[in-house]
Amino acid sequence: MNIVSDVNYATSVAALRMLQASAVLDVTEEDFDFLTGDKIWIATDRNRARRCVEACVYGTLDFVGYPRFPAPVEFIAAVIAYYVHPVNVQTACLVMEGAEFSENIINGVERPVNAAELFAYTLRIKAGFKETVMDAEENARQKLRANGLK
């Protein structure tokens, strides 16, 4: 790995820690089951899939009524690695393509990633966070239950 990859990976570690600490997911239990479930998303699920992933990315902002701002690839990939069932990871990357790495956002460089790049980066995250990702669904379900959702 080069220095940029190390920085990107460290950014994803920080994103994953934020996800774990956050109790705010702006999704219903039905949408959470859709997001984390093993049912393969089909073409007609595209809008719902994007809405569900975005709800996890922007949940806190949406909950308090603040406007959204573009999330970096590292955060979106962490959300996909953390919440989306493996059978739907490629589809999630397809519907979420177009984000940019944090380094590019900071430097004002416009270079959106495509689905293949987002997928490759998500795989890198899943490889590095195996134990954390494996426990993600139960962790999130416990938080939903604690907030009164079943």
Swiss-Prot record:
It holds the Pfam family gpD. One of its GO terms (biological process) is viral procapsid maturation. GO terms for cellular component: host cell cytoplasm. Keywords: Host cytoplasm, Viral capsid assembly, Viral release from host cell. It is found in: Host cytoplasm. Its main location: host cell. It comes from the Viruses. Belongs to the microvirus D protein family. Assembles the procapsid by joining twelve 12S pre-assembly complex into a T=1 icosahedral particle, called 108S procapsid. Ten proteins D bind each 12S complex, which are formed by three pentamers of F, G, B protein and a H protein. The scaffolding protein is released from the provirion after genome packaging to form the mature virion. Component of the procapsid particle composed of 60 copies of the internally located B, 240 copies of the external scaffolding protein D, 60 copies of each of the viral structural proteins F and G, and 12 copies of protein H. This is External scaffolding protein D. It comes from Escherichia phage alpha3. The gene is D.
